[in-house]
Amino acid sequence: MVTINTESALTPRSLRDTRRMNMFVSVAAAVAGLLFGLDIGVIAGALPFITDHFVLTSRLQEWVVSSMMLGAAIGALFNGWLSFRLGRKYSLMAGAILFVLGSIGSAFATSVEMLIAARVVLGIAVGIASYTAPLYLSEMASENVRGKMISMYQLMVTLGIVLAFLSDTAFSYSGNWRAMLGVLALPAVLLIILVVFLPNSPRWLAEKGRHIEAEEVLRMLRDTSEKAREELNEIRESLKLKQGGWALFKINRNVRRAVFLGMLLQAMQQFTGMNIIMYYAPRIFKMAGFTTTEQQMIATLVVGLTFMFATFIAVFTVDKAGRKPALKIGFSVMALGTLVLGYCLMQFDNGTASSGLSWLSVGMTMMCIAGYAMSAAPVVWILCSEIQPLKCRDFGITCSTTTNWVSNMIIGATFLTLLDSIGAAGTFWLYTALNIAFVGITFWLIPETKNVTLEHIERKLMAGEKLRNIGV
């Protein structure tokens, strides 16, 4: 631990240094998202070869996919404690180390049971990253760029997906699924190196009573010393509330409202159904008439590129367009896309589809993913990091992140079962209905938080304002 004295805390910094530090923090922490994206993408391409190698049933295929989410849900339960004890920085370090171990274990698995166990370890690592990185970024960013910095995390997720799809396509010619899974260890090592140079979160430092260090970090990140001191004072005011976590959740209705809203948001994100496209894209395109592995992987890569470019656009629009408009438009686009995709797949099931419907299926999949990438994918993480009161932020985000992974596990573990029971059309139309419902929930319940400080949101929440008004 580096001790920063008062003199260093008063050292002036140039605007260029401030911008460089903000960029470094954003990119370094967002590498955690890259790891998440790599694991999402790599299993889509590796699963057909793993299925052939171990002769897997549909149920075991679902477990190979969803075991990562199971581990993430388990890891999320301990994230609050880990983040409070070690801080955001060293929580990221722990996640990166586990990611290396899980990747190597997956690559050298000699049985499906060993593979599932290794993917549970990967899941714990991903769960730590998905909790800690958005939280860290929200606490490091000023209110006018907070959405952009957290969206950088989602952009890195999509970049990871695209890189995984590219890697899968390259290795698909030889069917080397072990190389597909083992290559994930490389960016995890990069994250370990980058985390060494990251500063601790000023809010975590203040919570530990290390106010001089907290001010020094804020001075590294804010345009002026006055802004740094003003923000530190706001943090101190927020910390005057003594109770925290579970104790505060039990006795304070407003805290419960924030926690339940975060859980609802994460469930909504997952039950859009978009991650089943990421996990099972080759299978979906096989149902859509693409018969060869090469055709399926190329179509999958196109979807990944769509995800990445749409997320890139979202990075520069989320702080301008606002959270609520993005969600309402995104859910509407996903509802339309899944509706038409279900129709296309029904024609293939009936044997009445033309070749043009194959490409329409790809187009609808791209539309769904673009809608997701520009709305629920980044915005839900942004909102969940913004709405929790500081004194119980670890607890609140632990609850919402756990909900994300449990919901993620459910959709991953039920997709093939749904296909067998209600068909491809019924499966995607189920997600159409859910997305329509989410438009209404967004309109009536979700707050707009753009360009608002975390402390302002907390004051409105604790004053008992309606949830949709806490950002006003």
Curated annotation (Swiss-Prot):
Q: Where are the transmembrane segments?
A: 30-50, 64-84, 92-112, 115-135, 155-175, 179-199, 258-278, 298-318, 326-346, 362-382, 405-425, 426-446
What is the membrane topology here? Multi-pass membrane protein
For whether the record's keyword set contains Cell inner membrane, the answer is yes
Task: Write down the InterPro entries for this protein, in alphabetical order.
Answer: MFS_dom, MFS_sugar_transport-like, MFS_trans_sf, Myo-inositol_Transporter, Sugar/inositol_transpt, Sugar_transporter_CS
An example of a GO molecular function for this protein is: symporter activity
Keyword Protein transport in the entry? The reply is: no
Known catalysed reaction(s)? L-arabinose(in) + H(+)(in) = L-arabinose(out) + H(+)(out); D-fucose(in) + H(+)(in) = D-fucose(out) + H(+)(out)
Provide this UniProt record's keywords sorted from A to Z.
Answer: Cell inner membrane, Cell membrane, Membrane, Sugar transport, Symport, Transmembrane, Transmembrane helix, Transport
List residues in topological domain: Periplasmic: 51-63, 113-114, 176-178, 279-297, 347-361
Q: Name one GO biological process term.
A: fucose transmembrane transport
PROSITE patterns, sorted: MFS (PS50850), SUGAR_TRANSPORT_1 (PS00216), SUGAR_TRANSPORT_2 (PS00217)
Parts of the chain on the Cytoplasmic side: 1-29, 85-91, 136-154, 200-257, 319-325, 383-404, 447-472
| Classification via CDD domains | MFS_GLUT_like
Gene3D superfamilies attached to this UniProt entry: MFS general substrate transporter like domains
Q: What is its induction?
A: Induced by arabinose. Transcription is dependent on the transcription factor AraC, the cAMP receptor protein (CRP) and cAMP.
Q: What compartments host this protein?
A: Cell inner membrane
Which domain of life does this protein belong to? Bacteria
Q: How is its activity regulated?
A: Symport activity is inhibited in the presence of the uncoupling agents carbonyl cyanide m-chlorophenylhydrazone (CCCP) and tetrachlorosalicylanilide and 2,4-dinitrophenol. Activity is partially inhibited by N-ethylmaleimide.
Could you name the Gene Ontology cellular component terms for this entry? membrane; plasma membrane
Known role: Uptake of L-arabinose across the cytoplasmic membrane with the concomitant transport of protons into the cell (symport system). D-fucose, a nonmetabolizable analog of L-arabinose, is also a good substrate.
- Check the record and name the PANTHER family matching this protein: PROTON MYO-INOSITOL COTRANSPORTER
Its family remark reads: Belongs to the major facilitator superfamily. Sugar transporter (TC 2.A.1.1) family.
Sorted alphabetically, which NCBIfam families does this protein's record hold? SP
The name this protein goes by in its record = Arabinose-proton symporter
User: What is the native source organism of this protein?
Assistant: Escherichia coli (strain K12)
